[in-house]
Amino acid sequence: MNYQDNSLKSLKLGQKTEYASQYDRTLLQPVPRALNRDGLGITQNQPFTIGADIWTAYEISWLNEKGLPQVAIADIYLDYQSQNLIESKSFKLYLNSFNQSKFTDFNAVQQTMQRDLIECAQGDVKVRLNPVAVYDAQKIEHLQGDCIDEQDIEITSYEFNANWLKDCVSDEIVEEKLVSHLLKSNCLITNQPDWGTLHIHYVGKKINHEKLLRYVISFRQHNEFHEQCVERIFCDLMHYAKPEKLTVYARYTRRGGLDINPFRSNFENLPENLRLARQ
């Protein structure tokens, strides 16, 4: 399926838009996961068995029944098996549409969002709306693992190249958690930079850290959505390194009041939503 499919041409990304102030669920726009999975050959059978797109929404406001503005922060878990992912700008516009709309309480807003996102994604979605006080107590966290970024290597190419992972393993069997803060890709539609921290947890033949870092850096001028990049990394690692167990998790920096943090694994449970230094 070509990326010039009508489902991408109609997206609000990159287009001049008006901001609605009254609740409007029709602002949400789906992107079929098959657009990317077809190219990876995983439309029917994914190599990961656990996963979600974990969103944090920082800019949520509505009016209570007396017209007093309310604010909250939301944790949203969009199941990897949903038919669609949610296009981020449409999600922002949708959230903005709550601003001048009255709701009875937190629960009414949470249930409304969950219902609308399930309908758009065509799959399971969990929404947890939190008072700001909950986040006041939240610490800046870091992802556990060895950082592979401080290597004295020369980089001359920034074009995506999965072949950096060719012959990337030794015969030594290990369990490793690896972290890189150098993940950068570009939005598929607008070419805006997307900055992320990548976490890889695997059991299997030891992966060469230099080859892995060169592979991660090769995303630097690559155009794909966050969710698609993580699934591509998972598939490439399974193809070249063939680990027995694998988790790929990326936490991207915030844009438009939203951060997107895709998690894919074949052995680990979903993590709690946390916050890194760059988020």
Curated annotation (Swiss-Prot):
Pathway, per record: tRNA modification; tRNA-queuosine biosynthesis
Active site positions: 187, 194
InterPro entries in the cross-refs: GTP-CH-I_C/QueF, NADPH_dep_7-cyano-7-deazaG_red, QueF, QueF_N, QueF_type2
Catalyzed reactions: 7-aminomethyl-7-carbaguanine + 2 NADP(+) = 7-cyano-7-deazaguanine + 2 NADPH + 3 H(+)
Molecular function in Gene Ontology: preQ1 synthase activity
Entry EC number(s): 1.7.1.13
Binding-site residues for NADPH, renumbered to this chain: 88-89, 255-256
Residues given in the record as substrate binding sites: 86-88, 226-227
Keywords, ordered alphabetically: Cytoplasm, NADP, Oxidoreductase, Queuosine biosynthesis
GO cellular component, one term: cytoplasm
GO process terms (BP): queuosine biosynthetic process; tRNA modification
Compartments, record wording: Cytoplasm
The protein's role, per its UniProt record: Catalyzes the NADPH-dependent reduction of 7-cyano-7-deazaguanine (preQ0) to 7-aminomethyl-7-deazaguanine (preQ1).
Subunit structure: Homodimer.
Family designation: Belongs to the GTP cyclohydrolase I family. QueF type 2 subfamily.
Protein's recorded name: NADPH-dependent 7-cyano-7-deazaguanine reductase
Gene name tied to this protein: queF
